Amino acid sequence: LGDVYKRQIKDMQLAAKRIAVFWAPNMSLGANLINLLSKLTTTKLGKDFDIDITDLHHKHKKDTPSGTAKFIQEEIHDSLNKIKVKKKVNISAFRSGDSTGEHSIIFSGEGERVIIKHISSSRNIFANGAVRVAAWLHKKSPGFYNMSDFLKI
């Protein structure tokens, strides 16, 4: 399942008692990897660095910011809470041209910046990710799985 807004999490958790259920806001492996890298980077730099997210998609995309950007923001806030840091993580969303999707997480400190970025150039990556996850999930016991489980991180 790739429901961006977590609307049906409770139903999915109930189903996971009987079958293997997978949830991710984005089925791109690269987009999920930058999320995991951002969480790690937040635990190391979050205390001293400002954190911002950029979200670029085609001009016809309806949601602003995207579900992926909101999910990354939420995960970064969770990582900040773990290191007991309270700060705002801004999202700057742009809808322009025909971009399939581009997300950057920018950690800005004194005299340096760390930028974690993912650019999708084809919508095929979402289908390819879903197919790979489905093949993996097929072998799993009942439970509620996410991209961290799939990527083994």
What are these regions (language model features)?
Residues 1-5:
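Short, small-residue-biased leader/transition segments that mark boundaries at the very start
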Residues 6-7, 31-32:
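Conserved catalytic-site region of short-chain dehydrogenase/reductase
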Residues 11-28, 46-51:
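Rossmann-fold dehydrogenase core element
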Residues 13, 27, 38, 124-127, ...:
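Hydrophobic alpha-helical segments
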Residues 13-19, 38-41, 69-72:
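Short, hinge-like loop/turn segments at secondary-structure boundaries
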Residues 23-31, 58-65:
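Short, surface-exposed loop/turn motifs that are enriched in glycine and acidic residues
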Residues 32-48, 64:
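Rossmann-like NAD(P)H-binding beta-loop-alpha module
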Residues 47-153:
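C-terminal substrate-binding/catalytic lobe of Rossmann-fold NAD(P)-dependent oxidoreductases
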